Regions:
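Extended alpha-helical scaffolding segments
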Residues: 1-141, 168, 174-558
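Long, acidic, intrinsically disordered low-complexity segments
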Residues: 92-109, 555-604, 708
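Aromatic- and glycine-enriched beta-alpha-beta binding-site module
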Residues: 147-175, 621-668
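Non-catalytic, well-ordered alpha-helical scaffold segments
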Residues: 156, 211, 215, 591, ...
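Amphipathic alpha-helical scaffolding segments
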Residues: 156-159, 163-185, 223, 287-294, ...
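Eukaryote-specific, cytoplasm-facing alpha-helical/coiled-coil scaffolding segments in long proteins
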Residues: 178-199, 297-298, 312, 621-623, ...
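A contiguous, surface-oriented mixed alpha/beta subdomain in the mid-to-C-terminal portion of proteins
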Residues: 259, 626, 645, 649-772
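N-terminal interaction modules that seed assembly of large macromolecular complexes
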Residues: 578-639, 643
Length: 772
């Protein structure tokens, strides 16, 4: 609610002073990590001992930095060129600032009776209203005051705090309808309708941060002769113009303005006046000042990138028209690295055609300093990006974007061209790899009959977020790398491993519906899309995105460090190899054993065959304590029974082992139905197998498929199947086995890497004995 103006305020205003040149009000972070308040005079005198400005918000920090830059530009009246700048860089201190502040001290008094700093004396509304300080203290997020201790409203501010928010208001105040002030001819029925946000609020601001505040100030102190910039000789900050009055400055006084960086850094986009008493500020009057169109300010504003607006060119008939390139709050800064470190204009069809985008001139300035040898080759820098994200017709601040990148000056020098190329191409790698993860989520959604768009976007963002820290750390290492190309190859492998883990998590949690899949249209006709095919596509896309050889698809469930599946598989291989050799040579005992195994419905018959063959000690005495004997027995018994069903009465070996092309279950079923899209019965059996929830149901579905394999004379590696059956019974094993069957089903000969020599290679003993 508005507060009534206090009658004592004019008396208090004449009695009090808050001199920003001598009073502590700027929050700074010292090199020792301590935050303190300093005056304008102190901040320049001690800049070499300070780390940075430490504002209440990132946007406030930038607004205060731009104020300091305007002071420094004006105090040195330049720099005009690199030589001027280097003299400042080489000097022990910024000696010109102190006398400059003395000369303009009256204009830096927050409470001055006639020229209060960045305010309009005697500003008032027609009703004499004084409004809550919420009008100038930014709410982040929307509707939630940043200072939670001051909920639900900001009732009072110290003079130091108020000074900071006054600077912030001119830079980032919201748009929307504001109460009109006396003598503002834009007022209609007591209101002034939206005229835009503060000037800095329209920017995707980027600046360079050095090791100290002194370095930061000088690195952003762009010379007047910088290519692409045009600073007028009469460029000066707000305090060297006539004091503002209520309403807009007369147009005749704005001719040729803004005149340069000093003018823009202090542009008076608002008219305001603080109301206070002896202990602080308790209210404010806030209205519109001088609105500023962002069109083609690229010759005066160095702290933002620019994009060419074809729509505005068509509308106005003027060419070219550049607008500030705002930050995308959903994307980390490193995804835009190309626009920051590559100095050439982008997408110019011909030399005479204006570029579609322009790099921030402040970064062109760093490149120029490097080209002229004014900065060391590997000096550490931070590129910082700050921006306000406005909501609802820009009448509120929804969020604040802040990000940074740590790198070195090498990336701004021609000697670092190779490093820049690898850094930018690694961003392309990351973006494409995140797209692959998003496509996996989309394919799984399609396979389950869901809308693919939202999962794609969500998983892509998750992929970018997962790569974020890895890329930033890699970029720091890149600066010192002798072989940037080799380091990028390392980055690609790291990124691949990370996104494979995320994809694995997604696939592990895929639903039974996604495993069942859908028949979908593709450029090659009908296609059965399920979670297994989605996984194959994911690996293919990821390998392509990261310029790696085809990602090796593990066709069997991972054994990790658990020796149990291998031990169980070795036993099954030994038993089945022996029985199969004896059966194929016509030994009666083996024929009898096979008949008993084939008709076995329980474990008794299988146990009898194992006992008669002398394999019981091996089954009961497996070397690893990690083996779950109950699960091992069930796996071995089931595998023997299935093999017997498969083998009898065939004269060829139905159990076949090979490290190079293992007869895996999924691959065998694919041979059974090469066109699975048109093989409904086989596909349904395979789906039911994968969705089986109990071990008896699993074996029942396997028996049906094995019968089909037997009829087609298609072999199977039963040692691997035994390992699958053992793993299936472990926690998480059902999904792992189903995925391995799906991978082998969709694997194509010659395009998928065969399993690497590992525990599977040891399943084929070379000293098989005939024990039947």
């Amino acid at each position: 609610m508005p507060e009534k103006s206090q009658s004592a305020a004019p008396i208090v205003r004449r009695q009090l002073s808050f001199d920003l040149t001598s009073q502590p009000w700027l929050p700074v972070l010292r090199l020792d990590g301590v935050i303190e308040l300093v005056s304008l005079r102190e901040v320049f005198a001690r800049a070499h001992t300070l780390r940075r400005i430490a504002g209440d918000l990132p946007t406030q920090e930038l607004a205060l930095l731009r104020l300091l830059l305007a002071i420094l530009h004006d105090a040195v009246d330049g720099p005009r060129d690199v030589a001027d700048w280097y003299a400042l860089w080489s000097a022990d201190s910024l000696t010109a600032v102190a006398p400059y502040l003395d000369a303009h001290r009256d204009r830096f008094d927050l409470l001055h009776p006639t020229t209060p700093f960045f305010q309009v004396a005697e500003l008032r509304t027609a009703k004499g209203e004084v409004f809550s300080l919420n009008r100038i203290v930014a709410d982040v997020p929307n509707g939630e005051p940043f200072f939670s201790a001051r909920l639900p409203a900001v009732d009072r501010l110290s003079f130091a705090e108020a000074a900071r928010w006054v600077v912030h208001a001119h830079a980032y105040d919201t748009s929307g309808i504001k109460t009109g002030t006396l003598d503002d001819d834009r007022t209609v029925r007591g209101k002034v309708y939206p005229l835009g946000v503060g000037w800095a609020g329209s920017l995707g601001a980027v600046f360079v941060e050095g090791r100290t505040l002194r370095e930061t100030l000088l690195l952003n102190l762009v010379a007047a002769d910088t290519h692409g910039l045009r600073f007028a000789d009469h460029d000066r900050p707000a305090w060297r113009h006539l004091p503002c009055s209520a309403g807009a400055t007369p147009l005749e006084l704005l001719v040729g303005r803004p005149s340069g960086a000093r003018d823009l850094y202090t542009w008076q986009t608002r008219r305001l006046l603080l109301h206070y008493d002896g202990s602080g500020v308790h209210g404010v009057v806030l209205g519109y000042g001088d609105p500023l169109s962002p069109h083609n300010k690229h010759r005066q504003e160095p702290m933002t990138g620019w994009r060419r607006s074809l729509a505005q060119e068509t509308k106005s008939g003027e060419q070219p028209i550049y607008l500030p390139k705002e930050h995308d709050g959903t994307r980390p800064l490193w995804l835009a690295l190309s626009a920051l470190v590559e100095g050439r204009p982008t997408d110019s069809p011909t030399p005479s055609e204006p570029a579609s985008a322009l790099r921030p001139r402040a970064l062109n300035w760093i490149s120029r300093l490097m080209a002229e040898g004014r900065l060391p080759l590997d000096m550490p820098l931070r590129l910082r990006a700050v921006g306000a994200v406005y909501g609802t017709q820009k009448s509120v601040i929804d969020d604040i974007f802040e990000d940074h990148l740590s790198l070195t000056t090498r990336l701004f020098h021609e000697q670092g061209a190779g490093h820049v190329q690898q850094a930018v191409e690694a961003v392309t790698d990351a973006s494409a790899a995140a797209d692959a993860l998003g496509a996996l989520a989309s394919d799984l959604a399609r396979a389950s009959g869901s809308e693919p768009g939202p999962p794609r976007r969500a998983l892509r963002e998750r992929g970018v977020a997962a790569l974020d820290g890895m890329y930033r750390a890699w970029l720091v290492r890149l600066a010192a790398a002798d072989d940037p190309h080799k380091l990028r190859k390392h980055w690609q492998r790291e990124a691949c491993g990370l996104l494979l883990c995320l994809g694995d998590e997604l696939l592990t949690n895929a639903s039974d519906t996604a495993w069942e899949g859908r028949t979908v249209e593709s450029v090659r006709g009908l296609l059965w899309l399920n979670s297994a095919l989605a996984e194959r596509w994911f690996h293919s896309r990821l390998a392509k995105a990261l310029h790696l050889p085809a990602v090796s698809l593990p066709l069997e469930p991972p054994a990790s460090a658990d020796p149990a599946p291998r031990e169980v598989a070795l036993l099954a291989a030994h038993v089945i190899d022996s029985l199969q050799k004896s059966y194929l040579t016509g030994r009666p005992a083996a024929v009898t054993s096979l008949a008993r195994l084939r008709n076995a419905e329980g474990g008794a018959a299988v146990r009898a065959v194992i006992n008669n063959g002398g394999w019981s000690p091996q089954l009961n005495g497996m070397g690893s304590a990690a083996v779950n004997m109950r699960h091992a027995e069930k796996a071995v018994y089931a595998a023997l029974s299935l093999w017997a069903l498969h083998q009898q009465p065939r004269a060829e070996a139905m159990h076949q082992q090979s490290c190079r092309e293992p007869a895996l279950l999924g691959a065998a079923i694919r041979r059974l139905a090469p066109r699975i899209e048109s093989s409904g019965p086989v596909r349904k059996r395979f789906v039911r197998l994968g969705n089986a929830r109990t071990f008896p149901a699993l074996i029942q579905h396997l028996r049906g498929l094995v019968a089909l394999l037997q009829a087609r004379n298609l072999p199977l590696d039963y040692s691997l199947l035994t390992a699958d059956l053992y793993i299936w019974q472990q926690p998480g094993g059902r999904q792992a086995v189903r995925r391995s069957w799906g991978r082998s089903f969709h694997a194509r000969r010659g395009t998928d890497a065969v399993p690497e020599a590992g525990w599977l290679a040891n399943l084929h003993p070379s000293d098989d004995k005939d024990s039947s």
